[in-house]
Each structure stands twice: as C-alpha cells, then as structure tokens.
C-alpha cells in the first residue's frame, strides 16, 4: 500500500510540474518540466531524508556522546526486529521527534534537545518506539518524499506568481500560456501541496502509536508522553518548523487555529491518548 502511495505522490508531482511548465512555456515548457520532474523524483528518493535532517540542523550522535539515548534506541530497535538506525539530535528546545529514510536499512530517528529534557526515560522510550514503528511499517519513505514534494510545489507556486506578473504578457500556445495560466497555477500549486500532505494518511499515526506501545510494552508511557508533548509544544512552538514537513513529527510542530486543525495531518491528540489508555487495560499481543 505504501509503495502505491509513493508512486501516486511522484505521479502527482510530475503532472503538476508539467502543467506548470505548460502555463509558463507552452509545449517547450512542458517538455522541460517533464524532465525536471523526473530528475526531482530520483533526487527525492535518494536524498530527501538528508534534506529534512539538514533543514532542522540535526546532528548525528554516537553512543559515546549520549550513551543513555543511543542505547535506548538500540534496545528498542532490537525489540522491534530492526537494524540500528542513525540517531540524531535537533538543536531545538521545542519537544518533538521524527523518523526519516528510505527503508529500515537506511533509516534515521531524530529527537529535539527539548524532548530529551522534559520526558522521563519511560516516556521517551514510548516516543522512540513510536518512531521506530514508522520505520517498521515503512511509512518513512512516503513521509519524507511528501515533505520534499510539498516544499518544492510551494516554492514553484511562488516562482509562478512572479513569472505571471513579470512575464505573463504572452499568450501564444507555443511560447507560453500567458498571465492567466501562470496565476491559475500559482493558486493551484499551494493547494496541491496541502493535499499531498493530507494524502499521508492520519491512520498511520494511530498505527504507529499502537505498534510503538507494543514495542516498548507500556501504552501509558506513550500516552503520558503525548499529553506532555501536546501541552509543551503549544507553549514552546518550533519556530523553524515548516508546513511541508509538519507531518513528519510525532506532534504537530505548528501552531494555529481551527483551519490548521481542519487540514492537520495529525489525528486529534485526545483520540490518540484515549486509544493508548484503552490498550493499557487489555493484554498486549
């Protein structure tokens, strides 16, 4: 299922970029955009995880640098039947964490300095088990590619606005789609980016919560961690967070009103906590 979702995401990106090329440069623009999209798809597959980690200034750590945290991840990886992922720390006081990579053999988990400070060892174990569940369930590729694609589409939308304003007088079919086509694509592009992010199903968070609770063996530890993170992340939002990558994190790093909640890629926190608390009163299989 995740392979199908990844293919659909890449196809959507290709079609959108071809449409953008047509709006700006007609048939020649379509051809150029098609080859550019193909190159971006290959680049996203191989390098999107590195881009996301660099975007947040994540620093890879060794066991010697942080034996407690590194050892915790290694122990949980063994319990989950996974290869040892690379471990990163993000220099941010806002408490959060995410997983990224192509597959279990090329995976990384990252946690902020803030989450390492405010959670108890048991709560942190629940959070990292959740992130390793994304690796085990192979959510990480589609999540990371979605982040790269959404960011690229938003950037192209901004470029199209300027192109439509300063170069949109042409209306020849061969040379360009004109100002109206460029403006239309500038409006469509950010909406498409939002829809791509929403395509990364909310249900994967529920599954990662459940799988993570089974890996660490303590649903209440993860429930308590989510409750604490939900409160702390609102009081101390991640200033460097970007909408294109918000869906990667265990809790939404963005702050906003009802509209943000409506289009959030994360399920309601109270529902996630309730499901975990219900798990605590039945045998874990």
UniProtKB/Swiss-Prot annotation:
Keyword Hydrolase on entry: yes
Membrane topology classification: Multi-pass membrane protein
Domain of life: Bacteria
Cofactor: Zn(2+)
Disulfide bond listed as a keyword: no
InterPro entries registered for this protein in UniProt: HtpX_protease (IPR050083), Pept_M48_protease_HtpX (IPR022919), Peptidase_M48 (IPR001915)
Bilayer-crossing regions: 6-26, 28-48, 140-160, 176-196
Molecular function terms from GO: metalloendopeptidase activity; zinc ion binding
Major enzyme class: hydrolase
Places the protein is found: Cell inner membrane
Keywords, in A-Z order: Cell inner membrane, Cell membrane, Hydrolase, Membrane, Metal-binding, Metalloprotease, Protease, Transmembrane, Transmembrane helix, Zinc
GO BP annotation list: proteolysis
Chief location bin: membrane
Family per record: Belongs to the peptidase M48B family.
Entry protein name: Protease HtpX homolog
Source organism: Geotalea uraniireducens (strain Rf4)
């Amino acid at each position: 299922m995740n392979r199908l979702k990844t293919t659909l995401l890449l196809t959507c990106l290709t079609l959108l970029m071809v449409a953008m090329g047509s709006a700006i440069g007609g048939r020649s623009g379509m051809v150029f955009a098609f080859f550019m999209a193909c190159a971006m798809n290959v680049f996203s597959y191989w390098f999107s995880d590195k881009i996301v980690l660099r975007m947040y200034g994540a620093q890879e750590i060794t066991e010697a640098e942080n034996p407690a945290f590194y050892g915790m991840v290694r122990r949980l990886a063994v319990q989950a039947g996974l290869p040892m992922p690379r471990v990163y720390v993000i220099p941010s006081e806002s408490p959060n964490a995410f997983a990224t990579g192509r597959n279990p053999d090329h995976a990384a988990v990252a946690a902020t300095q803030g989450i390492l400070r405010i959670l108890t060892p048991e709560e942190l174990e629940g959070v990292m088990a959740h992130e390793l569940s994304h690796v085990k369930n192979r959510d990480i590729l589609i999540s990371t590619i979605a982040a790269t694609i959404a960011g690229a589409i938003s950037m192209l939308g901004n470029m199209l606005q300027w192109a439509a304003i300063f170069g949109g007088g042409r209306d020849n079919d061969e040379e360009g789609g004109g100002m109206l086509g460029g403006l239309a694509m500038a409006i469509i592009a950010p909406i498409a980016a939002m829809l791509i992010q929403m395509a990364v199903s909310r249900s994967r968070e529920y599954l990662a919560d459940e799988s993570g609770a089974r890996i660490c063996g303590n649903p209440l530890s993860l429930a308590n961690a989510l409750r604490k993170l939900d409160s702390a992340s609102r009081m101390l939002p991640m200033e460097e967070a970007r909408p294109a990558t918000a869906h990667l994190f265990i809790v939404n790093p963005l702050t906003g009103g009802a509209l943000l909640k409506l289009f959030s890629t994360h399920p309601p926190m109270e529902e996630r906590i309730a499901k975990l608390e219900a798990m605590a009163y039945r045998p874990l299989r």
